[in-house]
Design a protein with these regions (language model features):
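Hinge/cleft segment of the Venus flytrap/periplasmic-binding protein
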Residues: 1, 5, 16-20, 106-152
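Extracytoplasmic "Venus flytrap"
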Residues: 3-8, 59-60
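A general structural signal for well-ordered alpha-helical segments in protein cores
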Residues: 10, 63, 111-115
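Hydrophobic alpha-helical
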Residues: 12-13, 24-27, 31-92
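Conserved beta-strand scaffold positions in the cores of enzyme catalytic domains, especially
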Residues: 25-28, 81, 102, 130, ...
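Short beta-strand elements at the ligand-binding edges of bilobed clamshell
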Residues: 28, 96-108
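Flexible loop/hinge segments that line or gate small-molecule binding clefts
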Residues: 76, 85-100, 138-151
């Protein structure tokens, strides 16, 4: 089951692609955000003859699962793989050149904002109903500027 943020992430990706006719979605699979689900789902798509140029995953564990399937089929080096989270494992894969990028979230910042919002609610203060927290795209060009063992 996807949470609203996951559904919004997927919808935003699809909406953005719809604005660019050079790109098309050739396959979709639900990984439930889990590596162990993403790998067989990606394998199934590949066995159906769906060979992507790029794979956009719900999160970094899904990206790692998709990468494992692509590797088994000899396609990882030919496929751009994107994840979301900025997980240490994803940053390591980016550093090694196996993964293309991850949109790094900051669990620390998310926790701070959540605590501030709960505090405001409990004190009867005004609070933002919708909060956007910026992310950073981690690529091979900037991955060394991040803590490889931790989160942002």
């Amino acid at each position: 089951m996807l949470f609203r943020s996951g559904m919004d992430r997927i919808q935003g990706f699809c909406d953005t692609l719809a604005l660019h006719p050079d790109y098309q979605i050739i396959g979709r699979a639900d990984s439930a955000g889990q590596l162990e689900v993403a790998m067989p789902q990606m394998d199934r798509l590949l066995e159906q003859g769906i060979v992507p140029d790029a794979v956009m995953c719900l999160n970094d564990p899904s990206a790692l699962g998709a990468m494992a399937a692509l590797q088994e089929h000899g396609l990882l080096e030919k496929t751009a793989v994107y994840g979301v989270d900025g997980a240490p494992e994803a940053k390591s894969m980016i550093s090694e050149g196996a993964m293309t990028a991850t949109a790094a979230q900051s669990p620390i910042r998310l926790g701070q904002i959540t605590a501030q919002t709960v505090y405001a609610i409990l004190n009867g203060e005004d609070y933002e109903k919708e909060i956007t927290v910026p992310v950073e795209l981690v690529t091979k060009d900037n991955v060394n500027g991040y803590d490889m063992d931790g989160w942002q």
